[in-house]
Amino acid sequence: MNSPLRRTRGDLIATGVIAGVSALLLGTAFFTAPARDAHLVAAEEEQEDYGQLAVVPKSFSEGFSLPDTSGRDQPLVASGMVITYNDNTLSATTPEGETVWTYERPNELCLVDQAWGKVVATYRDNAGCGDVVAIDAKTGKYAGTRSAIAPDKVVRLASNDRVGYASSERAEVWRSDLVRTVEYGHVEAKQEPDMQPNECTITSALTRTELVAVTEICDDGAFLRLQEATPEDSRKPE
């Protein structure tokens, strides 16, 4: 019968060093996390879903105005509330002009969209425009987060069923829990070879329900690619 192993002084020192390094790394990650400086003020109570007008009014008059520097080319409305961005702050405002929740964060805002009754904001960190937060539009409470390596310059890629981004290098979309369902184009750290058949220059991208469409320019010409929004493997387009 073998004698039991005994801990030596060297073992204890090694264990202490490993524990110390682990604690240092965890502490560094905590204190340097981009979301640490975020400040969310939720709604005092859940708001009603204001929905959409059933009949187009015969005339319009301005009820109120809000500054918006999000860079969007059209207003953003979620659950009937107007979502705006100004001075590093996202705000949700009712049709009566009352601001019911705000989300402030010092990081640069890359994109903001809405889907599934949530506001989805994408921020820049030290790994590109890949730090994402979802906020329930009616309550102003956190509804999900994700963080991944992403390009520095991205454009909107969203519908009522999917949200994501597109760039000249790659495109990806996420489902309601912010889990990625499609990854197309250049992959920074490939886990398996030959998963991406066309690493070309993407010129535009759209998504609707269960479809993702991408136009791109390759060495052998220009192409329109249609693929499923929920393939069997998110890393391999179908």
Give, region by region, the residue ranges found by the protein language model:
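N-terminal "mature head" segments of proteins
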Residues: 2-116
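A short beta-strand motif characteristic of beta-propeller blades
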Residues: 54-68, 96-104, 141-147, 180-183, ...
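Repeated scaffold domains used in trafficking and secretory/extracellular systems
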Residues: 63-77, 104-118, 148-161, 190-205, ...
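Short beta-strand elements that form the blades of beta-propeller/WD-repeat-like
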Residues: 73-85, 115-127, 132-133, 155-173, ...
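Hydrophobic/aromatic beta-strand positions that recur at structurally equivalent sites within the blades
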Residues: 93, 133-136, 173-176, 226-229
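Well-ordered mid-protein domain cores that form the structural environment of catalytic cofactors
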Residues: 112, 130-147
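A charged, solvent-exposed segment within the mature domains of Sec-exported extracytoplasmic proteins
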Residues: 142-190
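Acidic, serine/threonine- and glycine-rich low-complexity intrinsically disordered segments
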Residues: 183-238
